[in-house]
Regions:
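Short helix-adjacent coil turns
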Residues: 7-19, 33, 52-57
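Residue-level signal for cytosolic alpha-helical hairpin/rod architecture
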Residues: 1-5, 23, 42, 59
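Generic hydrophobic segment detector
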Residues: 1-14, 74-80
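Amphipathic, coiled-coil-like alpha-helical segments
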Residues: 29-80
Length: 80
């Protein structure tokens, strides 16, 4: 699923609308796969981005948490 890389690209481009879409997609994928930690952090990021036209200061810590949870999730999957 390309949604994490799309989220990273959107955040780098400071595109709040694209970041919202990518975070929302990643949230859905995470929930469908029962990846609870990642689903929780992406849900928080999605709600913070909802309706935003630009990225605000509160977004960066939430995005950092998503990146951390994504890395942890991928590491766990690779151990299987």
């Amino acid at each position: 699923d390309p949604s994490f890389s799309q989220l990273c690209d959107a955040m780098a481009a400071k595109n709040a609308d694209e970041a919202f879409r990518a975070a929302h997609t990643l949230k859905g994928v995470s929930k469908n796969l029962s990846l609870t930690g990642l689903a929780y952090s992406t849900s928080n990021l999605t709600e913070a981005l909802r309706g935003k036209t630009e990225l605000t200061d509160d977004i960066d810590p939430l995005f950092k948490k998503v990146k951390k949870d994504y890395a942890l999730t991928m590491a766990c999957i690779q151990m299987l």
